[in-house]
Every structure is written in C-alpha cells, then in structure tokens.
Design a protein with these regions (language model features):
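Secondary-structure boundary elements
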Residues: 1-59, 67, 75, 136, ...
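Hydrophobic/aromatic-rich core segments of domains that either
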Residues: 31, 63-152
C-alpha cells in the first residue's frame, strides 16, 4: 500500500530530524536502510525507484544508495550518488583482483563523507570512485544504444591493481 509506505518513510525522516547532530542522523539513516532492505542480486533493475526498494525490502547497491539518498535529502541533509568499483578481496601490492561495479553515498557533514550502505561501512581504499551525481541516471557506468537480438545481455568485468599503500 503506497499510502502506508509513504507514512512509514515520513516517520523515518522525522526520526532523522530528531537527532542532535547531522552525524547522528547520518549514522541512524545508514542503520535504517540496512534494517529495512536486504541485498538480493538480480532483484531489481537500474530503473527501480527508492520507493520500490522500500516497498519490496530488497535490492542491490544502487537501491540501498537511492533509499539512503531519499531519506537524507528529505531530512534536509545534502547527499549525492557515487558510482564506481569495489574490490572485496585483500591482495598483495601489485596483484590484480576482480572488482565489481558499485554505488554508494557521499553525505555533507562539514565536508563530503563516503558511506557504503550496502556493506554498512565507511568508504575506503577498496572503493574506486568513477563519477558523482544526483542519482544513478546521472552517472551510469555504461550508457548508449544497442541494436541487435532481444536476448542479448551485458556483463561488466573489472580488474583492480593496488600500486601503493
């Protein structure tokens, strides 16, 4: 029910506004998103909205990011969408590992801070920033027109090599 979902999100926004500091509101927002959305690969598309992710309670990185952005902005906290890559393995210096396309949030708290709501952590050296924007539509990793068979798919493979520590 859309009305109930809107009422629930409005209640979450009020919880954020009730915090003493922006840092507390940002931390609470991350917790709220993690508590209400579960990671489910392939459960959504790039056109899935934050409202749809809230309603289904599942999504992928861009859904976690859009959900967090919608709450933060509704609470008056500036935030932006970040597109990039994430490598999830520790590797030796100079060793190449596979990375994954990924999305996370940057939020203004006296300076821009990166938060990864999908993995419930601060953005660090495992995150490789490619672009920033208002939402996914501003910074898709690939954009264009394809003409061909209807059954075609697209895959992304990323290799990351850390050169310095």
């Amino acid at each position: 029910d859309d009305a109930r979902d809107d009422e629930s999100r409005a209640h979450l926004v009020e919880q954020l506004r009730a915090q003493s500091t922006p840092a507390q509101a940002i931390s609470l927002c991350n917790e709220l998103v993690r508590d209400r959305i579960s990671y489910a690969a392939g459960s959504t598309t790039v056109s899935t909205t934050a409202s749809e992710a809230w309603a289904t309670g599942s999504g992928v990185c861009q859904d976690f990011t859009h959900a967090m952005l919608s709450l933060l902005r509704s609470a008056g906290i500036p935030a932006r969408y970040v597109s990039g890559y994430l490598h999830t393995e520790e590797q030796a210096l100079g060793e190449t590992v596979r990375g994954e396309s990924h999305a996370w949030v940057e939020v203004w708290n006296g300076g821009w801070e990166g938060l990864d709501p999908t993995n419930n952590r601060a953005v660090g050296s495992a995150h490789v920033l490619v672009a920033r924007g208002r939402d996914y539509a501003d910074v898709p990793p690939l954009k264009g027109i394809y003409a061909g068979g209807a059954s075609q798919g697209l895959g992304v493979e990323v290799e990351i090599t850390q050169l310095v520590r």
